[in-house]
UniProtKB/Swiss-Prot annotation:
The protein, known as: Nuclear export protein
Gene Ontology biological process: exit of virus from host cell nucleus through nuclear pore
Domain of life, source organism: Viruses
Protein's job: Mediates the nuclear export of encapsidated genomic RNAs (ribonucleoproteins, RNPs). Acts as an adapter between viral RNPs complexes and the nuclear export machinery of the cell. Possesses no intrinsic RNA-binding activity, but includes a C-terminal M1-binding domain. This domain is believed to allow recognition of RNPs bound to the protein M1.
Major place of residence: virion
Entry keyword Transport: yes
Locus of motif Nuclear export signal: 12-21, 85-94
Record's subcellular location: Virion; Host nucleus
A GO cellular component entry from the record: virion component
Keywords: Host nucleus, Host-virus interaction, Transport, Virion
Gene behind this protein: NS
Quaternary context: Interacts with protein M1. May interact with host nucleoporin RAB/HRB and exportin XPO1/CRM1.
InterPro entries in UniProt: Flu_NS2
Length: 121
């Protein structure tokens, strides 16, 4: 994985963990959890591309893998919608910067996962 992506994930997660949004901390904690899961999934998918044994294993369980991939894209879409929703409501510049960066990162990760998935198919 690109070291900039790792740094971006860590930076955004650290910033989000310090925030107290007006909506609720439960929503923010849910977003943080989803970001962490997405990072782990993206890392494991990238590592699978580097190991041929894992690549063949993924191809052998193709139906399950496609369902997992579909679920991850749903999670990404949910996170994008949540970031956009927060951006429309907040006037705090720290929150705006954080969620704009989170939105950009989500779009980059979605693109990377699509690229990996096309290579695995």
């Amino acid at each position: 994985m690109d070291s900039n992506t790792i740094t971006s994930f860590q930076d955004i997660l650290q910033r989000m963990s310090k925030m107290q949004l007006e909506s609720s901390s439960v929503d923010l904690n849910g977003m943080i959890t989803q970001f962490e899961r997405l990072k782990i999934y993206r890392d494991s998918l990238g590592e699978s591309m580097m190991r041929m044994g894992d690549l063949h294993s993924l191809q052998n369980r193709n139906a399950t893998w496609r369902n997992e991939l579909s679920q991850k894209f749903e999670e990404i879409r949910w996170l994008i919608a949540e970031c956009r929703n927060i951006l429309t409501k907040t006037e705090n510049s720290f929150e705006q910067i954080t969620f704009l960066q989170a939105l950009q990162l989500l779009l980059e990760v979605e693109s990377e996962i699509r690229t990996f998935s096309f290579q695995l198919i």
